[in-house]
């Protein structure tokens, strides 16, 4: 029996050639399938900016508060104006101020860079400016214009920034809008430069301005403001709930989109001095340390090796990278056996981070691992939280792998 082929509907393409129209269901699947790739494109371009800003900021804090022994409650500018520093120490303090200012600027560009490259991934280079503008407005929103009937005067007020939520929404919408306009707006060849350098940028910029002012900033700001209000009102219980949530979101995908979103939330709260970044910083290092530790203790606890041969050297590498603030060293373990690795390091990260916060460890500086440890309040408790989380992770993953091995559900290519 012959198999009949359903012919595709044909419509004129943008260049006049025939183009096949895809099945609507396929297009829908394609959208949701490609969206994570666009988001990861933005994240991958944003990470170097975060690293540069974080390391330079770390230098400024180490110089001022560890080397020059400035009290934690005194800012670098106040220390400069105190008149207590001269000569080489004064030069160091000036460099610390420069590093702090420059690092802060780099951090400020992280979200605009993210939004720009998400839009660029969706709509091409024509969407890059719209994404960047939207990302910038998500961190530095336009002032709100309000009329005060008591004084019969117009005045401005500052809205709550939509931050990562706003940047994510506007980058996706702007990217697809520019892509659609580029396909639908057809002009003669001699007007191509006008279209790409003037028409599309102006239309997309106006759209971003209106969308951010009237929709996205109010929506994202309402969410961010609500979260802050609830956590602040809840006091210590709110801080512990926040620590648990941030630790879980930080650990779950080991540097992926959820991790980065949690980072933006934590950094915004830390920058505004609402809540410290303690739980996130601890949760970054617990998974790789814990999984690396599991490769060391498995044979001592069970009498057999429970990991494949290639994971043993990777475990040591993961532990080393953890001290640099890099959690991606744990990814091979999560890929090899997600059912044993992910629950283990999630539990370890949540317990270790929450315990450290509950016992009084405080970190306001938005970096992780050795770059920030000299600036942590109650460092002993902080390190105990890391150790607790790592031990829980290691014991849990060894126990789960042993159970699966005994049930014949885990094949091990041992040394």
From Swiss-Prot:
Domain (PTS EIIC type-2): residue spans on this chain: 35-410
Q: Cellular location of this protein?
A: Cell inner membrane
Q: Which domain of life is it from?
A: Bacteria
Q: How does the record comment on the protein's domains?
A: The EIIC domain forms the PTS system translocation channel and contains the specific substrate-binding site.
Annotated membrane topology is:
Multi-pass membrane protein
List all membrane-crossing ranges.
Answer: 47-67, 102-122, 127-147, 158-178, 198-218, 238-258, 277-297, 319-339, 342-362, 379-399
Main subcellular location: membrane
Which BP terms in the Gene Ontology apply to this protein? phosphoenolpyruvate-dependent sugar phosphotransferase system
Q: Which GO terms describe its molecular function?
A: protein-N(PI)-phosphohistidine-sugar phosphotransferase activity; protein-phosphocysteine-sugar phosphotransferase activity
Q: What Gene Ontology cellular component terms go with this record?
A: plasma membrane
InterPro entries from the entry?
Bacterial_PTS_Sugar_Transport, PTS_EIIC, PTS_EIIC_2
UniProt name for this protein = Fructose-like permease IIC component 1
Q: What does this protein do?
A: The phosphoenolpyruvate-dependent sugar phosphotransferase system (PTS), a major carbohydrate active -transport system, catalyzes the phosphorylation of incoming sugar substrates concomitant with their translocation across the cell membrane.
**Matching Pfam families, A to Z?**
PTS_EIIC
Q: Which residues lie on this side of the membrane: Cytoplasmic?
A: 1-46, 123-126, 179-197, 259-276, 340-341, 400-415
Could you list this entry's UniProt keywords, alphabetically sorted: Cell inner membrane, Cell membrane, Membrane, Phosphoprotein, Phosphotransferase system, Sugar transport, Transferase, Transmembrane, Transmembrane helix, Transport
Q: Which residues lie on this side of the membrane: Periplasmic?
A: 68-101, 148-157, 219-237, 298-318, 363-378
Q: Which organism is it from?
A: Escherichia coli (strain K12)
Gene symbol? fryC
- From the UniProt annotation, give the residues forming the signal peptide: none
**Could you tell me which PANTHER family the record lists for this protein?**
FRUCTOSE-LIKE PERMEASE (PTHR30505), FRUCTOSE-LIKE PTS SYSTEM EIIBC COMPONENT-RELATED (PTHR30505:SF0)
